[in-house]
Amino acid sequence: MSDLLAGAYLAKGTIGNVGTPGAPIATFSLVVVPSQHSVTGTVIITQAVQGPDSHIVVPVTGKIYAAGLGKFTQLVSLKGQYVHSVPPPAIGSFLAEFNAHFAIDNAWNGVGGFSYYQHNVENVPVAAAKNLQTELA
């Protein structure tokens, strides 16, 4: 049973153009189990522009696989759902989809993209959290 979690570790970072005014940023905190090719955690999407999509919390699951793509050594895919509330004058909420994909190196830096209700962000940087970079070095 303990072999199921062999090599498990925590990965934290961002997807998006951090520092660009108004750009949506997806911050991830994931438990990665390479032996099972599984990823589970939380993504928080933030945007400086106020509105219904300015702070979204999404529980996610996904897959991680080894890659042979030059400097990128791993491919990650994430998916999840969150409750999206419709702004007035409409009334109601529904489950919206979140998807992300990225190609990263062993330090969790690379390139990727993500999509959520009526938003699609592609070809943006993926960056490991600063404290994670020293732990993985």
Give, region by region, the residue ranges found by the protein language model.
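Edge beta-strand at a domain terminus
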Residues: 53-65, 109-137
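A short, structured loop/turn motif at beta-sheet edges
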Residues: 31-38, 65-72, 104-106
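N-terminal glycine/threonine-rich, aromatic-flanked beta-hairpin/loop signature
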Residues: 32-57
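Amphipathic hydrophobic-ligand
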Residues: 22-26, 53-61, 92-96
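Mid-chain, well-packed structural core segment of small domains
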Residues: 61-101
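Short, cysteine-centered beta-strand-loop-beta hairpins and adjacent loop/turn segments enriched
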Residues: 18-22, 47-54, 85-89
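Short, solvent-exposed aromatic-acidic interface loops
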Residues: 43-49, 79-85, 115-121
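Short, solvent-exposed loop/hinge segments that bridge or flank secondary-structure elements
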Residues: 2-36, 54
